[in-house]
């Protein structure tokens, strides 16, 4: 569902603007369109999407209870004077659920910041694996497709199948293909990463049974990460196999920097870059054709311009988190929010939660909030380790984290039931508190947590 307002300065009745909007709407494959303003409702019949029109935001809000948002992904795009933040707040309040808000303006900003670091000829691959770092695969992939990135990357073939089913047409690389996924890879025009002779021969044999030729693949090279990939001394055998078969076409060869952000490992990182350069030059010479080369992910983009080669891979930096260069105008794109379900006033010596671990040493005000470990809030955040933001103040957890809820000590804060709670005011600090990284916190957010996407 898209909720769209008139855009100041844009004459939507102009055929050029109208045509562009029709194209955008077709790319989003909408089930319903809600139009707000004086101009858009006049051209509603021009869109091949069921629509409802309102004269202004107040009129929409007055009728919001008559609309169903169950199981819907809602995208808001409104001019500032339409104050769509009121709609976002009401949609979240209507559900009284924990939500992950994704700011699409911030995502686009971050994408453009990294693009500006790159020479024009360098292509951009973006990572949408692991539910796009928790942010929602199709919605983020659609934004990236609209912004014309060159490649998308997923971990498993079923993620790529879902994106194809949702209308994503960009090339999609599958990082962890296996024999059971070959059929889907071919059927949905996905491009597998080939990292060993076992997977290479298995895929070759599969393609031969289907009488398929020139199928695109991406060669993974182990330059020092020692996770997946062909070792440098295997290049001659790899060339021999690929030359003997007309079944495969190498679209790229790549590796992964193990420690690009660590100053102490600069020599090791340079060795990895040099190894990729040497391996790929030999591979290109042996095959008799060129392909894309890439090794730099987010940290590499920020710190290693000599590692750009032909393409770079943007992952966590797209979401504005865990970056190495603090001079970049990056914005955090996601905010995990919940609300206060109940407040209790308890005397000193009472205990809170399972196993009575939350001991009160003073008369206290305790807030129960609607997030637990089934939502992806780690149990290690219990008993004061986790800190959340309530009405501008950091407050600690108290007691063990429950499956669907947890408790906060809000004794020193003015707070009421249904007040908003920011779960990770500083996600890097939160990750450090339990000895992990922001990636894990983001990718652990359960899919039962609603995702709310908005443009400012």
Label every model-predicted segment.
Residues 6, 33, 76, 163, ...:
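Residue-level signal for inorganic ion chemistry
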Residues 3-5, 75-77, 127, 218-222, ...:
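Short beta-strand segments
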Residues 47-59, 169-170, 189-192, 309-315, ...:
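Active-site regions of enzymes building and remodeling cell-envelope glycoconjugates
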Residues 1-109, 116, 157:
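ATP-dependent carboxylate-amine ligase
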Residues 5-8, 35-41, 79, 130-131, ...:
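Short, ordered loop/turn segments at secondary-structure junctions
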Residues 31-38, 53, 74-76, 152-154, ...:
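Short, hydrophobic beta-strand segments that form beta-sheet elements in well-ordered domains
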Residues 101-103, 108-111, 116, 123-126, ...:
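Active-site anion/phosphate-binding pocket segments in diverse small-molecule metabolic enzymes
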Residues 99-101, 106-108, 122-292, 308:
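Active-site-proximal beta-alpha core segment in soluble small-molecule metabolic enzymes
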């Amino acid at each position: 569902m898209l909720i769209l307002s008139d855009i100041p300065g844009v004459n939507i009745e102009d055929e050029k603007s109208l045509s562009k909007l029709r194209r955008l709407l077709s790319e989003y494959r909408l089930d319903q369109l809600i139009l707000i303003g004086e101009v858009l409702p006049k051209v509603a019949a021009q869109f091949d999407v069921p629509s409802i029109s309102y004269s202004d935001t107040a009129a929409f809000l007055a009728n919001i209870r008559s609309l169903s948002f169950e199981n819907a992904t809602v995208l808001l795009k409104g001019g500032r004077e339409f104050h769509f933040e009121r709609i976002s707040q009401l949609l979240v309040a209507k559900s009284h659920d924990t939500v992950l808000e994704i700011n699409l303006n911030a995502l686009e900003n971050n994408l453009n910041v990294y693009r500006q670091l790159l020479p024009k000829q360098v292509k951009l691959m973006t990572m949408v694996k692991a539910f796009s770092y928790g942010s929602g695969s199709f919605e983020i992939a659609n934004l990236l497709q609209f912004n014309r990135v060159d490649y998308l990357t997923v971990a498993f073939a079923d993620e790529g199948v879902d994106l194809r089913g949702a209308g994503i047409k960009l090339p999609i690389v599958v990082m962890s293909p296996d024999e059971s996924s070959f059929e889907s890879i071919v059927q949905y025009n996905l491009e597998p990463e080939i990292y060993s002779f076992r997977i290479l021969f298995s895929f070759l044999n599969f393609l031969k049974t289907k009488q398929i030729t020139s199928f695109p693949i991406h060669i993974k090279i182990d330059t020092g990460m020692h996770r997946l990939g062909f070792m440098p001394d295997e290049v001659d055998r790899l060339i021999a196999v690929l030359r003997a078969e007309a079944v495969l076409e190498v679209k790229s060869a790549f590796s992964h920097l193990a420690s690009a952000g660590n100053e102490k490992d600069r020599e090791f990182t340079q060795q990895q870059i040099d190894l990729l350069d040497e391996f790929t030059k030999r591979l290109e010479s042996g095959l008799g054709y060129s392909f894309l080369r890439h090794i730099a992910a987010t940290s590499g983009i920020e710190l290693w311009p000599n590692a750009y080669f032909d393409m770079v891979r943007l992952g966590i930096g797209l979401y504005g988190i865990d970056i190495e260069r603090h001079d970049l105008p990056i914005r955090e794109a996601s905010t995990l929010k919940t609300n206060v379900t109940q407040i209790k006033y308890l005397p000193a010596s009472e205990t809170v939660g399972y196993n009575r671990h939350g001991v009160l040493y003073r008369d206290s005000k305790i807030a129960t909030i609607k997030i637990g470990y089934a939502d992806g809030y780690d149990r290690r955040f219990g008993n004061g380790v986790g800190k959340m933001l309530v009405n501008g103040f950091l407050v600690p957890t108290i007691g063990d984290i429950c499956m669907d809820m947890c408790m906060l000590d809000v004794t020193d804060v003015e707070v009421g039931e249904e007040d908003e709670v920011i779960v990770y005011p500083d996600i890097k600090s939160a990750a450090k508190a339990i000895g992990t990284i922001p990636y894990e916190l983001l990718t652990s957010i359960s899919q039962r947590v609603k995702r709310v996407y908005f443009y400012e």
